[in-house]
Regions:
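Histidine-centered active-site microenvironments of extracellular/periplasmic hydrolases
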Residues: 91-95, 280, 284-327, 364, ...
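Short loop segments at secondary-structure junctions
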Residues: 325-330, 357
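Active-site-proximal alpha/beta segments of enzymes that process anionic O-linked groups
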Residues: 14-76, 81-244, 318, 343-375, ...
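Short beta-strand segments
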Residues: 117, 157-159, 211-218, 262-268, ...
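Membrane-interfacial entry segments at the cytosolic side of transmembrane helices
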Residues: 2-9
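A long, amphipathic alpha-helix that forms part
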Residues: 197-200, 238-290, 342, 346-348
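C-terminal, low-complexity/hydrophilic appendages and adjacent surface loops
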Residues: 314, 388-394
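Active-site rim elements
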Residues: 132-135, 185-186, 254-269, 276-280, ...
Length: 394
């Protein structure tokens, strides 16, 4: 009878777990059936990716009115899990981005959006918003890489992040693919410095119209694997940040993760600075633009006892956005542009604008560089701000 009672209680617990969102998150066995179904659908999509890409190319051909004939190179660097609140470039007390600060100080055309958000908190979902058009401007699904391809751009994809979905849905549009990381998941220890010689090589070969996309592993958990182990902090580890974490009741584990995250940020500072410097070195005599953003942010202990991906706090969506160009035809009024907020799901419109690809649908109001830019805060961000409990940023 006792065993029967225990079995009955376990059955109730199992049923209860289906009902509770939090339990579904903590005990994924309860959602395996639905997950299997979703993966089956996605697998079928990937199996037919060539047909899907043909649809995207047909759509692009139908909507492009002017492809732009001027040779130029655009370098798009996409980071991972970078929260601008942990960048000294954006006012963080730890000196985590000294090289970017130096570039910002000395380069007139180097700009940062003071406010920037992703509208998704995970990589694939963020890519889907960054490189695809939302339904509003098009009656059918649009893909910015298809537009670039139809406009005559040579597309190079350099990746240090192994992701089947990203490869299937995005890298297949490229003319050249350089995959530097064959190990997926959080346990990969592939250093982002691998992309630097590949970027230099791609820039040396660039001719005509070229789009180079560099996908970094960035600050993807595990943070301790995102920087060389001999890298040392340039700040006192018992500084005001550490004290704030203690005062806010952060666990010892999260205090350690915070230190690892900031060290990973210091390493990323070097990588990003070098991608910029390499791009600039190869910009003589040709129009070149450099764009950086993170796919999404990460919660770093400011709002919750949490370090990492977060769908429920603003840190999960808070990102940096950086831009540089040597093009004289792009009007750069730093004070005005840097005040403009940026949203990741509007990236594709700005890329079209830089490339000079004109379309049957309007996009000027969503292009950060355009004089007709009109900011609308993402509803996801507005809702999170309403529920923000701790506004203190240290």
């Amino acid at each position: 009878k006792i065993l029967d009672g225990v079995a009955f209680l376990l059955l109730l617990l199992f049923c209860f777990s289906f009902y509770q969102d939090a339990w579904r998150n903590r005990f994924p066995i309860c959602v395996y059936m639905d997950l299997y179904h979703q993966l089956s659908i996605q697998k079928d999509f990937w199996a037919n990716i060539e047909k899907e890409n043909e649809k995207y190319l047909h759509t692009a051909e139908k909507y492009i009115t002017q492809a732009g004939d001027k040779p130029q190179t655009i370098v798009l660097v996409i980071g991972e899990s970078m929260n601008r609140e942990d960048m000294s470039l954006y006012g963080y007390s730890r000196k985590t981005t000294p090289r970017l600060e130096e570039i910002d100080k000395n380069e007139r055309n180097f700009l940062k959006a003071k406010i920037a958000y992703s509208t998704r908190f995970s990589t694939v979902a963020a890519f889907n918003t960054m490189l695809e058009f939302d339904p509003a401007p098009l009656p059918e699904h649009g893909h910015v890489l298809a537009f670039f391809k139809k406009a005559g751009f040579h597309i190079v994809w350099i990746s240090n992040q192994e992701d089947t979905a990203i490869h299937a849905e995005y890298q297949t549009f490229s003319d050249e693919n350089v995959s530097l990381n064959r190990k997926g998941g959080r346990s990969s220890a592939s250093m982002d410095e691998k992309v630097l010689p590949e970027l230099a090589s791609a820039l040396e070969k660039a001719h005509g119209k070229t789009l180079i996309i560099v996908h970094l592993i960035g600050l993807h958990p595990h943070f301790s694997l995102r920087y060389p182990h001999d890298l040392k902090p340039n700040w006192d580890e018992n500084d005001e940040v550490k004290q704030m974490l203690k005062n806010n009741g952060q666990s010892l584990r999260n205090q350690l993760l915070k230190s690892q995250y900031d060290l990973a940020m210091l390493y990323q500072d070097t990588i990003l600075a070098k991608t910029f410097e390499i791009t600039k070195e190869h910009s003589a005599g040709q129009p070149v633009s450099w764009v950086y953003l993170s796919d999404h942010g990460a919660e770093t202990g400011r709002r919750d006892d949490l370090m990492g991906h977060s769908s429920t706090t603003l840190g999960g969506y808070t990102i940096p956005f950086l831009f540089w160009t040597n093009r004289p035809d792009v009007k750069l009024i730093a004070e005005d542009l840097e005040k403009r907020p940026f949203r990741g799901d509007w990236l594709s419109y700005m890329l079209l604008d830089i490339a000079g690809i004109q379309c049957k649908f309007p996009y000027a109001e969503k292009s950060w560089l355009n004089e007709n830019y009109l900011w609308t805060e993402p509803k996801e961000i507005t809702e999170l701000k309403k529920h923000e409990k701790n506004q203190e940023i240290y």
